[in-house]
Design a protein with these regions (language model features):
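Non-catalytic structural scaffold of enzyme domains
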Residues: 1-179
Length: 179
């Protein structure tokens, strides 16, 4: 049985989940956290689903050996591929993150929203279910964004390469009238 002072594990395929960790620390200042990034195998977005499930499972078990009382999958791709599987296998809470379709659909003024994610996320049954549950009559322009995560992981936020990728991925969303 986990103790109150046991840490909450947080995992991502890379460093992007640090923003999730920051938010968790702000919301739960009395909690301890362990962060694990799989930088050796990042990005996961174009990897086979079986690879993503096994990497996620391995990291979760590592965090369990460190006494994690819960695990946050701070990665859309890991959530889409492995969250339901891990919830069936483990007795601790497995908390995933997903593209913010529900709040975006509720707040849109144009009736059009855009989602940029990894190919594995955009093709997942979990994401398609999310759209069915929360998009309603809102048009969702979904764009798989290969190469963008690699730029983020390198800290390459303002290079010509990153700007070209962003233009490529944001243009169909903008052209569709998304707000």
């Amino acid at each position: 049985m986990p103790a109150a002072r046991d840490p909450i594990g947080v995992l991502d395929s890379g460093l992007g989940g640090l923003s999730v960790l920051k938010a968790l620390r702000e919301e739960l200042p009395n909690e301890q956290f362990l962060y694990c990034a799989d930088c050796a195998h990042t990005p996961w977005g174009d990897k086979p689903e079986s690879f993503i499930v096994e990497r996620t499972r391995a990291i979760v078990h590592f965090l369990l050996r460190k006494q994690a009382k819960a695990v946050v999958l701070a990665c859309n791709t890991a959530t889409a591929a492995a969250a339901d599987i891990l919830r069936k296998e483990l007795s601790i809470p497995i908390i995933g993150i997903e593209p913010a379709v529900k709040p975006a659909a509720a707040q849109t003024r144009t009736g059009v929203i855009g989602v940029i994610a990894t190919r594995r996320t955009t093709e997942s049954a979990r994401y398609l279910s999310l759209l069915r549950r929360f998009a309603g009559n809102v048009k969702v322009v979904t764009v798989a964004a290969p190469g963008l995560m690699e730029c983020v992981e390198r800290g390459d936020f303002n290079s010509e390469t990153t700007r070209k990728l962003l233009l490529k991925y944001l243009t169909p969303i903008k052209d569709a009238g998304a707000d």
